[in-house]
């Protein structure tokens, strides 16, 4: 939807498979909490060398999107259909916005993010619920939670009076056609099934 989601994921083997039955949940949760709550910084900003490396990775990912013509066509469709709306912003952003990123400004934004964003925790494994709760609560105990904002609800934009057609010529062997419909239907499940039937998934 209109909201940006940021995720942190840790994978670990079950204690029963660890040598000597070592308990792994707690140290892994602690590491995850440290990465989220206390990332490495330098003079109130992300470390420039690490920042520059990740910035280049982001730019490379944005530029390589055109190599997957289906994903590129989907991205162009949303940018044109939802121009001026948050939903029209590409998932990775644009080259222009990525180029403007700076370590100090990004760190300030990150601090705002972890202070105001809603937090959801998911665990899949065999550890008892109480143990998982204790491990995660301890790991995230320093996470500021007193300024959490409610998620804003957005109404879909109304359908255009006239069909918008956009063409882009590329050196490809197979063209891609994307069609977007602003329907605003409350019957979301049926709409998604219809999208799948018309070729909206790998199972179509």
Located regions from the model:
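Short, conserved charged micro-motifs
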Residues: 17-25, 129-134, 187-190
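His/Glu-based metal-binding/catalytic segments typifying zinc-dependent metallopeptidases
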Residues: 118, 146-204
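Acidic/histidine-enriched alpha-helical segments
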Residues: 38-62, 150-158
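M16 family metallopeptidases and their MPP-like homologs
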Residues: 1-38, 57, 61, 70-96, ...
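A common structural junction motif
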Residues: 30-42, 138-147
């Amino acid at each position: 939807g209109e909201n940006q989601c940021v995720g942190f994921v840790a994978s670990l083997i079950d204690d029963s498979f660890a040598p000597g039955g070592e308990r792994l949940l707690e140290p892994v949760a602690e590491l995850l909490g440290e990465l989220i709550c206390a990332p490495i910084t330098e003079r109130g900003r992300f470390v420039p060398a690490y920042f520059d490396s990740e910035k280049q990775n982001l730019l490379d990912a944005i530029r390589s999107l055109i190599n997957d013509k289906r994903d590129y066509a989907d991205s162009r469709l949303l940018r044109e259909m939802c121009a001026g709306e948050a939903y029209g912003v590409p998932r990775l952003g644009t080259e222009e916005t990525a180029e403007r990123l700076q370590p100090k400004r990004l760190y300030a934004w990150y601090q705002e993010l972890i202070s105001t964003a809603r937090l959801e925790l998911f665990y899949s494994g065999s550890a008892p619920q109480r143990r998982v709760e204790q491990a995660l609560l301890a790991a995230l105990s320093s996470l500021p939670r007193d300024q959490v904002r409610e998620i804003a609800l957005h109404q879909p934009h109304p359908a255009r009076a006239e069909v918008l057609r956009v063409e882009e010529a590329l050196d490809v062997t197979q063209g891609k056609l994307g069609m977007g419909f602003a329907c605003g239907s409350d019957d979301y499940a049926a709409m998604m099934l219809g999208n799948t039937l018309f070729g909206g998934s790998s199972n179509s």
